[in-house]
């Protein structure tokens, strides 16, 4: 047990899928896993363990923002022996060639947060995904006939940012999606010797203002979830 996770030792699989919303974690577990058991519920940050096509996998929410997700990722790795974390979440986009409901595999994550500079002695840390996990996700998408975008994310500290000019900079540098956690999770994984990947579904277009509802974000991002789950099986074979 930790101050934030009340699961017993051995309750989590070595691979954990982490959406931000704990209700989305519940939906994923109940929809895609078999033999599901709720293993933690502190602060209503729900976590579940079950099997997917016979493979033990856990699902747990991580909340919003780098501080929240970093706490859960660190404790899962150091206290429960988790080896791989796949963040499955929503993101916005500023690019006109990226559409709402597109799936993005985050090879790297830029950020305006200082957390990785703090852990990396005030130097820039390249927050990147594990290559094998990213490759497995691309293979899983291709096997399902799904088109995915692969590239950089931007993990923002402010959801309601006053710096709208930064969106132009993001677009210039080819940022595919804007979210709030990937850079933190990649930093935690690097610090504690684990592996991580972020897969996002575009829920909002910052330029056109097209967006999905909260219910759609919870229930209809199934392509992303299936890609993540199948990537675990592919990764086991690599």
Swiss-Prot record:
CDD domains: PNP_EcPNPI-like. A purine D-ribonucleoside binds at residues 4, 179-181, 203-204. Signal peptide: none annotated. It is an enzyme of class 2 (transferase). InterPro entries: DeoD-type (IPR004402), Nucleoside_phosphorylase_CS (IPR018016), Nucleoside_phosphorylase_d (IPR000845), Nucleoside_phosphorylase_sf (IPR035994). Phosphate binds at residues 20, 24, 43, 87-90. One of its GO terms (biological process) is purine nucleoside catabolic process. Gene3D superfamilies: Nucleoside phosphorylase domain (3.40.50.1580). This is Purine nucleoside phosphorylase DeoD-type. It comes from Haemophilus influenzae (strain ATCC 51907 / DSM 11121 / KW20 / Rd). The lineage of its organism: Bacteria, Pseudomonadati, Pseudomonadota, Gammaproteobacteria, Pasteurellales.
């Amino acid at each position: 047990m930790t101050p934030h996770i009340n699961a017993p030792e051995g309750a989590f699989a070595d691979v954990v899928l982490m959406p931000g919303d704990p209700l989305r974690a519940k939906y994923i577990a109940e929809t895609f896993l078999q033999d599901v058991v709720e293993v933690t519920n502190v602060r209503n940050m729900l976590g579940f363990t079950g099997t997917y096509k016979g493979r033990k996998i856990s699902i747990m929410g991580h909340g919003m923002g780098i501080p929240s997700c970093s706490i859960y990722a660190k404790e899962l790795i150091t206290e429960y022996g988790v080896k791989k974390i796949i963040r499955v979440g929503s993101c916005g986009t500023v690019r006109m060639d990226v559409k709402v409901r597109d799936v993005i595999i985050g090879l790297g994550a830029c950020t305006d947060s200082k957390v990785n500079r703090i852990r990396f002695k005030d130097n820039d840390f390249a927050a990147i995904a594990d290559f094998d996990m990213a490759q497995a996700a691309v293979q899983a998408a291709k096997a399902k006939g799904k088109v995915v975008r692969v590239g950089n994310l931007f993990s923002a500290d402010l959801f309601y940012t006053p710096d709208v000019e930064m969106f132009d900079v993001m677009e210039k540098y080819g940022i595919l999606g804007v979210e709030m956690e990937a850079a933190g999770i990649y930093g935690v994984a690097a610090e504690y010797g684990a592996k991580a990947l972020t897969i996002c579904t575009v829920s909002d277009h910052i330029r056109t203002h097209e967006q999905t509802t909260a219910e759609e974000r919870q229930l209809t991002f199934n392509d992303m979830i299936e890609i993540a789950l199948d990537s675990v099986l592919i990764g086991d074979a690599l």
